[in-house]
Amino acid sequence: MASTTSDKATPERRAELLQNLAETKICFAEASKSLSHAPTLVAVSKTKPAWMTRACYEEGQRDFGENSDIDLVNKAKKLADLESLRWHFIGVMKKTEGDDFRRQARMRELTMVSNLHAIQSLTSIEDADIYNGAIPADRKTPLNMLLQVNTSGEIQKSGLQYVDTEAEAADSPLFKLACYIIEHCPKLHFQGLMTIGSQTESLASSERPNQDFETLKKTRDVLEGMLRSNPAFNGRWGDNEKLLLSMGMTADFEAGLRAGSHIVRVGTGIFGARRMK
């Protein structure tokens, strides 16, 4: 796919962007052929200008993601006229000493985005409470929540520990958070799990199954079994009691789809490399 260092709204840059989107959709469709469900392509623009999101929307793309809550809120304001656009927040609001008040204010501002479809990076009960309490009263549907799982074990990556067995999961932060959302957060909906695979697995994913994705699938299976065993949870999680998986980015989204992912997140492959702020 083509790439460029200029993000100015020129006819040439627009044509390049839309060519990237078209090529991504071709690969997306090919990798999805064996799936029994219809997956979602989330276009992640990161630091790119709002005109690029609008251009992709005009070509039929509807789901867009941002790593930065500030970028998402700002772009949502600029693109408020795009009524069918669905925003996905896939980043992490890191906690810094003395900045907790500001962080909570940003979380509340994020929930004010009327077409915010999902937060794919939840990792704590504390944050679940903040989001649940901040949801506007006029929001018609609960906000979808995907719990981020660290499947690679890399310390630099966010996410909760994966689980292999029900015995292991019973006291795990991951299962406790899932149950907490279902039981105590009526304005949130526990929809699924998200992971960011390691570079090593991404590079090898064309030759063999991506082990990070296999780990997430196993974790999904364990959680589904435990949630289904509780009659009080019936109909209160997932999509028809099936947890959605968000796994796969530019370098490995095709492997993610082959592994059964419901959502893939493609940034560089569509928009080009991010700009340094």
Q: Which role fits each region the language model picked out?
A:
Residues 2-251, 257-259, 271-273:
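Conserved alpha/beta-domain cores
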Residues 261-277:
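Gly/Pro- and small hydrophobic-enriched strand-loop and loop-to-helix capping segments
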